[in-house]
Design a protein with these regions (language model features):
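C-terminal accessory segments enriched in acidic
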Residues: 6, 19, 189-261
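Bacterial N-terminal signal peptides
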Residues: 6-16
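N- or domain-start disorder-to-order transition segments that initiate the globular core
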Residues: 16-55
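Zymogen propeptides
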Residues: 40-41, 45-81
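Structural recognition of the beta-strand scaffold that forms the well-ordered cores
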Residues: 58-59, 92-96, 146-150, 237-238
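Solvent-exposed loop/turn segments at secondary-structure junctions
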Residues: 63-67, 98-102, 153-157, 242-245
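Membrane-embedded segments
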Residues: 66-83, 87-94, 100-109
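A substrate-binding/cap region within the structured catalytic cores of diverse enzymes
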Residues: 91-92, 103-223, 227
């Protein structure tokens, strides 16, 4: 049976230093504080891990390039790994920072078949990889954790926005598989919220924009499906920097049909 956190239980709110819980202003950009509830009650890292220890999936949002956020991610991953060892559960790291097209390169690095320079070059690592995401990958490599490259390839997403979802039918199978098999384009609350935010453009153009956004979001749900089918029941996944538009992907992923164990 799949266990899910309440919607948006994570990302946790960031503000100041985490251990012990306190509400003092941050002293440096490397200080963070976790908070919970509408009143943002201080929460220690150990308390946060205890809150999510039974979850199948932990979502961690981020402010790109903010040192405290990336420090939190590294600390959280280490704590979750220790918790998973104690509980006998597996742990998988899913990352926005690599696209699905780069999964073979990432796998080769984790297996020791290529070096870090090749990973950065051929895996199209972001410019801030050495400072912000390397600790996650190196920890996963040392602990022999599975790492999922979860992002959609940007060129494919751009073409969907320009040509529409029908363009995907023209792709060879090897490229088409890098996006979700089907895009969720129905008139659900996510689409309504997205369309309401657009204040220009015609209906067809906006529909293509929504298809592009959905093609960006859907591979995250696909990554969860891969994880669910490839690791033992009871394992959990932590996913930093979720690629969502104002929480819409999280809403969709929380639906019962989104994840099967």
């Amino acid at each position: 049976m799949t266990r899910r956190l309440p919607l948006l239980a994570l990302p946790l709110l960031l503000a100041a230093c985490a251990t012990p819980p306190q509400s003092q202003p941050p002293q440096t950009l490397y200080h963070y504080q976790l908070g919970e509830g509408t009143d943002d009650r201080p929460l220690s890292l150990a308390q946060a891990v205890d809150r999510v220890k039974d979850a199948d999936i932990v979502l961690v949002g981020e402010l790109h390039s903010h040192p405290a956020v990336h420090l939190l991610q590294a600390n959280l991953l280490a704590e979750l790994a220790e918790q998973s060892r104690q509980d006998g559960r597996g742990l998988v790291l899913s990352m926005e920072q690599f696209s699905r097209a780069d999964q073979p390169v990432l796998d080769a690095y984790l297996a020791g078949r290529i070096g870090e320079a090749a990973l950065i070059r051929d895996g199209h690592a972001w410019p801030n990889y050495p400072s912000d995401y390397r600790p996650l990958v190196e920890f996963a490599k040392a602990q022999q954790l599975t790492v999922i490259a979860a992002n959609a390839p940007k060129p494919l997403v751009s073409c969907v926005g320009q040509e529409g979802p029908e363009w995907l039918d023209k792709l060879p199978a090897s490229r088409r598989s890098q996006l979700a098999r089907e895009l969720t384009l129905g008139d659900d609350p996510y689409r309504q919220k997205f369309m309401a935010s657009l204040h220009h453009g015609d209906a067809d153009g906006n529909a293509r924009r929504f298809a592009a956004q959905t093609s960006w979001d859907e591979p995250w749900r696909r990554a969860w499906s891969i994880i669910s089918s490839s690791i033992p029941a009871g394992a959990s996944c932590t996913s930093p920097a979720t690629s969502t538009w104002r929480g819409g992907w999280v809403s969709r992923a929380a639906s019962p049909a989104a994840i099967r164990r």
